From Swiss-Prot:
InterPro entries named in the record: Arrestin-like_C, Arrestin-like_N, Arrestin_domain-protein
GO biological process: ubiquitin-dependent endocytosis
Designated name of the protein: Arrestin-related trafficking adapter 10
Function: May regulate endocytosis by recruiting RSP5 ubiquitin ligase activity to specific plasma membrane proteins in response to extracellular stimuli.
Localization per record: Cytoplasm
Species for this entry: Candida glabrata (strain ATCC 2001 / BCRC 20586 / JCM 3761 / NBRC 0622 / NRRL Y-65 / CBS 138)
GO cellular component, one term: cytosol
Pfam (any one): Arrestin_N
Length: 504
């Protein structure tokens, strides 16, 4: 009967996944039913990134008048590699002085403890990057990435093309035990037999903000002390790469068609800005204002309206954060903006009612290999409410419209009180710890894989009997951790001051 080998890992501190502060440790269990010759037993911690990209047929150039099949490009990056020997002990191993003679281990039950250091903050593949290496991030911005697509075998099925292309990238961390047998070598068995037992672990580093993927430009001052973000695309379609050059880091940020699978040569793609914003330089913490790229025209033919989301912290979300509750810093300040030469009475004569609300989370996963990038798009519905016009509490009141100073046109605003809706105020982000295609919800960037998210706020409007829709896209950094509690510095303990007498 073959020896039975198992790895029992100590659970992580949070009980769900290993993080940056965890020491990965455990026990190797070996059961032998008969004597076995063993040279050594080692346990290793390995991490690697693997990507496969393909070229679309329209970008494949024919050779000799013949159109060949699309080529594959593969990339492999080592992230971490540690090794511990648990048998024989160090003093015995040192005494052998290089002898290859095995140990004859008697039948029985054996346990060996092991422990690795904390995972480093930087991947080990960075030392192999040259100035011409094309990556999504520069060396200074690169951090140890989280596990991704650990169940890639279940996705790698040709009957579902979305999942098939999604499985082309993976980040795997594995603890593997290796037993080197000590059987004598012969001419027909020149190598020692190895017995291996791997166990994949899930690693997600501690929350840490990284540089935003959006390219922004400063365009003057705003009268209200806010940053204006305008989405230029109907879906998140940016594929940005970083190439180390002699003069510094060159950003390559192409935009492609709205496809679920895209392959291009990064050198042939144009640079395009996804967002524009304005900032009031005098404010220390300006509020950001995200608005629709395409406003809705009103029946008078000269006026328009759009939806704005104002927040300081909406670009970061933790698990179980409230999305609409007042004070959440997410969708608790949403406004309807009307621009034109309308007065209060003119706008009141127009029937404007919200009828439906939907909030989606857009996912963009990009893979890179040998200068060829592929993108995968998907959408997750976070919530949906119909029949808003029949609600007991209207979302906005036209009597609360107020004018905002403007040079050329009159601008009015009215708050859309999503925070007062009894259903929305209880909604928390990712309360059930949802796994999308086997992966928890989190954003990250690494050398050859990026996973980015954006909110998509859709509101259907009934304007004088016609149904129109506004769309607001907001890029967001998603963390799989719960928000850490605020650190409140405790006041020093009160000490009675010394007393002094008047006489000497």
């Amino acid at each position: 009967m073959a020896p039975k080998l198992d790895i029992i890992l100590h659970p992580p501190e949070n009980g769900e996944f290993y993080s940056s502060d965890d020491l990965i440790s455990g026990t190797i269990v070996l059961d032998l039913t008969k004597s076995l010759s063993i040279k050594q037993i080692k346990v290793g911690l390995k991490g690697f990134t693997e990507t496969t990209t393909k070229m679309d047929s329209e970008y494949v150039f024919p050779q000799n008048g013949m159109l060949g099949p699309a080529t594959e490009n593969k990339s492999y990056h080592n992230l971490v590699r540690e090794e511990r020997r648990v048998f024989p002990p160090d003093n015995v191993w040192d005494a052998l002085e290089g002898s290859s003679k095995p140990f004859k281990v008697k039948p029985g039950h054996y346990e060996y403890m092991f422990q690795f250091n904390k995972l480093p903050s930087k991947p080990m593949c960075l030392k192999n990057h040259t100035k011409k290496t094309i990556c999504f991030v520069s060396k200074s911005q690169s951090t140890m990435p989280p596990s991704f697509n650990t169940q890639w075998r279940e996705l790698n099925k040709i009957d579902n093309l979305d999942l098939y292309f999604y499985s082309f990238g993976k980040i795997i961390y594995v603890v593997e035990v290796e037993i080197e047998m000590g059987r004598p070598r012969t001419w027909f068995k020149p190598f020692d037999k190895m017995l291996r037992e791997p166990k994949i672990i899930e690693f997600i580093p501690e929350p840490k903000k990284f540089a935003s993927n959006e390219t922004v430009t400063r365009s003057g001052r705003n009268n209200h002390g806010v940053i204006d973000y305008i989405s230029k695309n109907n879906s998140s379609k940016s594929l940005s790469a970083m190439q180390e050059s002699e003069d510094g880091v060159t950003a390559i940020a192409p935009n492609g068609p709205d496809e679920k699978f895209l392959a291009r040569n990064l050198d042939q793609l144009d640079i395009n800005n996804d967002l524009e914003y304005e900032i009031e330089e005098t404010e220390e913490n300006p509020m950001k204002r995200y608005k629709c790229r395409y406003p809705l025209g009103l029946p008078d033919g000269a006026s328009m309206m759009w939806v704005e989301v104002r927040s300081r912290d909406i670009d970061t979300i933790y698990r179980q954060d409230f999305l609409f509750r007042q004070g959440s810093g997410n969708f608790d300040n949403v406004y309807l903006i009307v621009k034109g030469n309308l007065s209060f009475s003119d706008f009141s004569n127009i029937s404007v009612k919200p009828t439906r609300l939907q909030l989606n989370l857009l996912e963009t996963v990009s893979y890179l290999s040998q200068g060829i990038g592929n993108e995968n798009f998907s959408s997750l519905k976070l919530m949906e409410i119909d029949n808003l016009s029949k609600s007991d509490r209207p979302l906005f009141d036209t009597n609360e419209l107020k004018f905002i100073s403007s040079k050329n046109h009159e601008i009015m605003e009215c708050e859309i009180k999503l925070k007062d809706n009894p259903i929305l105020k209880r909604l928390q982000f990712n309360e059930e710890d949802y796994k999308h295609r086997g992966n928890r919800l989190y954003s990250f960037k690494t050398c050859v894989i990026t996973r980015l998210f954006s909110y998509q706020l859709l509101i259907d409007w009934n304007i004088n009997g016609q149904t129109r829709q506004t769309e607001t896209i907001i890029p967001v950094q998603v963390f799989a951790h719960k928000r850490p509690p605020p650190v409140n510095e405790a006041l020093p303990r009160y000490v009675e001051p010394p007393s002094y007498d008047d006489h000497v």
